[in-house]
């Protein structure tokens, strides 16, 4: 077993999953892959099973219904902790997140003894490819909104390319996570930051998918806007502890 696990939530990613799996398995660092399939209707789950049968590094969890990104990651985190992985990644399956950046995340986590490494689209400038101006403005506005309400100092608190250390995930009550969907990106980062864990950022380039369809929707956007207030109310005026 490799010490690093990549969690790939999938819903209808048949075009991307085989290519992503091949790319991840070719990385020199050596990683295991967990596909958490949300009851895909296009055969993605079956493709994942076929890949797992050929490659011992690939594993699959099947959800009986589309429970949302948040529930998929919680299932993946629990699976990873039960099996002793040291570094656990969140990552999109559609190549929006470049697999070649994984060694950079690992190096940053080890060299800086970080508990959570965030891939930032906005560290030192804007690093987004093939987004229309409207979407870029909405994204930047959301980042500012989250930072103001939560107090988090990070340039990209809503990003979805992350590397957690085992000790950080162990410190969170995963059953108490509120998020069902994309707002888990905000909630997990906020909980670790509030608990005093060391969170750092590394710059990444985010490239809009070329295969399949985006899962972003108005409901997802609204959930994230509401989540920051739930986190604020939950924490009140409690002071954040010093970094561990």
Language model features with spans:
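Donor nucleotide-sugar binding loop of glycosyltransferases
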Residues: 13-16, 40, 98
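Residue-level signature of catalytic and energy-coupling elements of molecular machines
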Residues: 24, 76, 94, 165, ...
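Cell-envelope/extracellular polymer assembly enzymes that use nucleotide-activated donors
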Residues: 3-5, 32, 187
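A conserved acidic beta->alpha catalytic loop
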Residues: 37-47, 95
């Amino acid at each position: 077993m490799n010490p690093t696990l990549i969690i790939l939530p999938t819903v209808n990613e048949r075009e991307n999953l085989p290519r992503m799996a091949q790319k991840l398995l070719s990385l020199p660092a050596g990683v295991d892959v967990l596909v958490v399939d949300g009851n895909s209707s296009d055969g993605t789950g079956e493709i994942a099973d076929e890949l797992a049968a050929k490659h011992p590094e690939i594993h699959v969890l099947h959800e009986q219904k589309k429970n949302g990104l948040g529930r998929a990651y919680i299932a993946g985190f629990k699976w990873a902790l039960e099996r002793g992985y040291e570094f656990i990644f969140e990552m999109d399956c559609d190549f929006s997140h470049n697999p070649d950046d994984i060694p950079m995340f690992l190096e940053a986590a080890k060299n800086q003894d970080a508990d959570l490494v965030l891939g930032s689209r906005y560290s030192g400038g804007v690093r987004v490819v093939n987004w229309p101006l409207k979407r870029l403005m909405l994204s930047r506005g959301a980042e500012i909104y989250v930072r103001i309400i939560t107090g988090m100092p990070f340039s990209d608190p809503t990003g979805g390319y992350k590397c957690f250390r085992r000790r950080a995930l162990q410190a969170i009550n995963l059953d108490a996570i509120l998020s069902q969907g994309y707002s888990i990106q905000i909630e997990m980062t906020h909980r670790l930051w509030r608990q005093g864990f060391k969170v750092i950022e590394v710059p990444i380039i985010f490239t809009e998918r070329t295969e399949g369809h985006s899962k972003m929707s108005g409901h997802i956007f609204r959930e994230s806007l509401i989540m920051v207030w739930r986190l604020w109310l939950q924490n009140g005026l409690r002071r954040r502890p010093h970094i561990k």
